[in-house]
Amino acid sequence: MKTGVFVFDVMTKQPISVYKDKNLADCANLMEKKDVNSLIIKNENNKVLGIVADEDFIRKAIAKNVDPFKTKVEEIMATEVITIEPDKDLYDAVKLMGDYNIRQLPVVENHKLVGIITVKDIIKVEPAIFEILSGKIRLKTGDKPDLIY
């Protein structure tokens, strides 16, 4: 079920990212300031090393009572990062998000970070896809009972 909309049409082209040695307090402040739910961790060559989401701060930092000023983001980031290429169909991004239960995908081209696509980005352009992501696909009743929306 391709949409005809590509990842590069929807993605945020300048994602918020940090280097792995940034402390958790600085990362949390940056996320608050930029109003984002995740940060991409990259190296000097713009290669994605990991990702940290707001729930990582809760499960891996707050719950374990770590010092946010002494703990580096590399200590709590997810290193097995699911990514997508900018020329993929939006449906492919939605499928990956659903399959891996994630809310964001770093967009990479030639192993370099070029953007990020989030559930919020997708909902802005294709609100109906939200129902797919949230697992609430329902059979529409009426004249055409086989129509899914």
Which sequence ranges carry the predicted segments?
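Short, flexible active-site loop motifs that bind/organize anionic cofactors or intermediates
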Residues: Q14-S17, K47-V48, T83, K112
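A glycine-centered beta-loop-beta connector
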Residues: M31-K34, L39-D56, M97, L105-K120
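Tandem CBS (Bateman) regulatory domains
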Residues: M1-Q14, A53-G98, T118-Y149
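The conserved cystathionine-beta-synthase
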Residues: S17-D35, K42, I84-N101, V108, ...
